[in-house]
Amino acid sequence: MFRAELHRLAGRQAEALANADEAVKISRETGPAFLGPFALGALALASEDPTVRRAALAEGEALLEAGAVSHNHLLFPRDAIEAYLEAGDWEGVERSAAGLAQYTHSEPLPFTDFYVARARALAVLGGQRSSAESLTAEFERLRKEGERLGLRVALGEIVKAIEKMRG
């Protein structure tokens, strides 16, 4: 999964897809509850085929509901949020953010709080459901928080949103 993510971030889509496919195959052979949702999230991000993406997201969500190991409840929603953002599926973004928030409700984590707030702000912007002024302040806050947490990979969309809002 990590190789798939690195290839995807470097713009090597074919390699990302091959690595994600292999990760899903291995997770199915060895027990999908351990890394299955995480692998399926990587596949959803690596695939440019909407059918493959939707199937990977649906299967990952089903595995979480069936009872996957804890790290999947943190990493799959992060990737699902990204996949839904790329697809412009604001309901999917909101649903994944809500699931992540619910999972960490009793033990909040800065990592998940950041991704939940980021997802919700980007969904609001994408759905054009808020004033520019309030959203700009939230994106500025998220940019600072993302920098503080070292989550540089998540900052690109935030910076784009700030630039878009400033016109």
Spell out what each predicted region is.
Residues 116-167:
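C-terminal structured "cap/appendage" subdomains that terminate the fold
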Residues 1-6, 10-11, 18-22, 26-27, ...:
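Conserved binding/catalytic microenvironments
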Residues 16, 53-56, 93, 131, ...:
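Single-residue signature of alpha-solenoid repeat helices
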